[in-house]
From Swiss-Prot:
Name this protein carries in UniProt: Organic cation transporter protein
Molecular function terms from GO: transmembrane transporter activity
Membrane topology of the entry: Multi-pass membrane protein
Organism, scientific name: Drosophila melanogaster
Originating gene: Orct
Residue stretches spanning the membrane: 23-43, 128-148, 159-179, 190-210, 220-240, 245-265, 338-358, 367-387, 396-416, 420-440, 454-474, 483-503
Length: 548
């Protein structure tokens, strides 16, 4: 008897669960605002050096004046000459080819009235600061997953959700009024941390209250709400051209979720784990009433017994050495699978965010590119609902990553004047990597043994965040050669897809429970039976020696 059996009596996805679930999906939209708005907050418009004779700030110059003032393909310096009227009229030749570094800039404000880049001149020698700001935001996401993950397990899902939501509101506004780059970046980093508290905790509450047969749908559908937020971010940027007002606009919708304090319950599953059975039973009874079902009294009695038994098991487990990531790296087959999974997580996160933040470098309408990049995620996630339990996890993971790699690498051969085809290849890659990213969550959970599953998933998530932290620097490479970010993402995706063929399929296979199960899972049989038996006995001896 377990809590999943209680959900079976309540209805795996009854009216009560649906109401709470869809309310919990809405914060994913706001978290998408914060994660992706950096594309517009730190938008880099066309720019040039302000020339010594200029008093205005009009970006456009005639081709004649441009050739007289700037070296070819150079935006961060200008010719160090005497800009007299005769020189500008072309009456006298240029006296020197020496250049001078810019001290101020003129920006093309036809698309962006004001961004953090234009306000603090984050171009040329300071362009690295723009990518660093996004990178530190993703570092905040990593730290938030560690901090708020621990908080939600110890203090509860609901308090953690609202603590992170309040912090998100406060530091979202502080980022908008930041007087300089440093305070803006720190505020945004804290906002990044809170997205883990808001989104991931809501995700956990939602999945903990639905039945097992609906969890794939529930997990994928919540990701689709994130994709909706992705697209809506472009809508905000279309109407709001000043970065400070844009930051406020994406923050204020979070105020609506404060009313959830009186609507969203604590996770009954978590309450039972903590021995707070009376509070859990109140929530179960409320759900039963709304679902118009009755939960038999013996169910509650069995739950009480289970809670007592679980407490004993936890006390026994606490006396044993805690599982660590080194347990996954100790044995050859398990180590090989773990490193492959880590690489898949790194690539999926890096490529996903690399493509999401690179839409401004694709050419064409930047807002349209960004919106399409969010829209293609919907079919990417929908694909999983119809294929993941039919075709297998490995087939989907490898197939989607290879499709992403091939489509992105194909941009090498696309002529520069066929911009629509470059965008199309990039969006096919984005759709495919979205499907891959959704698959790796399930696939890796089924690869790790039960005794170290949480450790393995936590380590995988951290490796993924490293990919996200590095992703903002990819778009800087587009200044060297525009297709370069797509080529790097494509090469990584194709490599990871091919290497994933070395992982065993997990569909309809029992998940490994012990370290020994994990080591043997997917291992090729030895050529001789005696060799196989000897290897198994040796491994068992190693494991028994470790546990002793």
């Amino acid at each position: 008897m377990g809590y999943d059996d209680v959900i079976t009596h309540l209805g795996e996805f009854g009216p009560y669960q649906k109401r709470i679930y869809y309310l919990l999906c809405l914060p994913a939209i706001v978290c998408a605002f914060h994660k992706l708005a950096g594309v517009f907050l730190l938008a880099k418009p066309d720019f040039r050096c302000a020339l010594p004779y200029e008093n205005g700030s009009i970006y456009e110059l005639s081709p004649h004046l441009w050739n007289l003032s700037y070296p070819e393909n150079e935006r961060c310096s200008y010719y160090d000459v005497d800009y007299t009227e005769e020189y500008l009229n072309g009456s006298i030749p240029r006296s020197s080819n020496e250049t001078k570094t810019c001290s101020s800039y003129v920006y093309d404000r036809s698309k962006y009235l004001n961004s953090a880049v234009t306000e603090w001149n984050l171009v040329c020698s300071r362009s690295l600061l723009s990518a660093t700001s996004d990178s530190l935001f993703m570092l905040g996401v990593l730290l938030g997953s560690l901090i708020f993950g621990q908080m939600s397990d110890k203090l509860g899902r609901k308090p953690t959700f609202f603590a992170s939501l309040v912090l998100q509101l406060i530091f979202g506004v502080l980022a908008a009024v930041a007087p300089e780059y440093f305070s803006y970046t720190i505020s945004r980093m804290i906002v990044g941390a809170t997205t883990s508290g808001v989104f991931l905790v809501a995700y956990v509450i939602a999945l903990e209250m639905v039945g097992s047969s609906y969890r794939l749908f529930a997990g994928v559908a919540m990701q689709m709400f994130f994709s909706v937020g992705f697209m809506l971010t472009a809508g905000f940027a279309y109407f709001i051209h000043d970065w400070r007002w844009l930051q406020i606009a994406i923050t204020l919708p979070g105020l609506l979720f404060l009313c959830y304090y009186w609507i969203i319950p604590e996770s009954a599953r978590w309450l039972l784990m903590k021995g707070r059975k009376d509070e859990a039973f109140v929530i179960i009874e409320k759900a039963a009433k709304e679902n118009k079902v009755e939960v038999p009294n013996e169910i509650y009695e069995q739950l009480v017994d289970e809670v007592a038994e679980k407490k004993k098991q936890d006390e026994m487990a606490a006396s044993q050495p805690a599982a660590t990531v080194f347990d996954l790296l100790r044995y050859p087959n398990l180590r090989r699978k773990t490193l492959l999974i880590f690489f898949d997580w790194f690539v999926n996160s890096g490529v996903y965010y690399g493509l999401s933040w690179n839409t401004n470098n694709l050419g064409g309408n930047q807002l349209v590119n960004f919106m399409i990049s969010g829209a293609v995620e919907i079919p990417g996630y929908t694909l999983l609902l119809f294929t993941l339990n039919r075709w297998g996890r490995r087939s989907i993971l490898c197939g989607t990553m290879m499709v992403a790699g091939i489509s992105l690498l194909a941009t090498i051969f696309v002529p520069s004047d066929m911009n629509w085809l470059i965008v199309a290849c990039a969006m096919i890659g984005k759709l495919a990597i979205t499907s891959s990213y959704g698959t790796i969550y399930i696939f890796s959970a089924e690869q790790f043994p039960t005794v170290v599953r949480n450790v393995g998933l936590g380590a995988s998530s951290m490796v993924a965040r490293v990919g996200g932290i590095l992703a903002p620097y990819l778009k800087l490479l587009g200044e060297i050669w525009r297709p370069l970010p797509l080529i790097i993402c494509g090469a990584l995706s194709l490599t990871a897809g091919l290497l994933s063929l070395l992982l065993p399929e997990t569909l309809n296979k029992p998940m490994p429970e012990t370290i020994e199960d994990g080591e043997n899972f997917g291992k090729k049989p030895a050529p001789q039976e005696t060799a196989e038996e000897g290897g198994t006995q040796e491994l068992s001896g190693m494991l028994n020696g470790k546990s002793g």
